From Swiss-Prot:
Disordered as annotated region, ranges: 1-20
Further comment found in the protein's record: On the 2D-gel the determined pI of this protein is: 6.5, its MW is: 24.1 kDa.
Name of this chain's protein: Unknown protein NF015 from 2D-PAGE
Lineage: Eukaryota, Discoba, Heterolobosea, Tetramitia, Eutetramitia
Length: 20
């Protein structure tokens, strides 16, 4: 489970860029 949480934050960062 901990491995899935690590890649999760990476996707959030990329999603914020396109949002702007």
């Amino acid at each position: 489970t901990p491995q899935i949480q690590k890649p999760a934050p990476q996707f959030s960062k990329t999603a914020l860029l396109p949002d702007e």
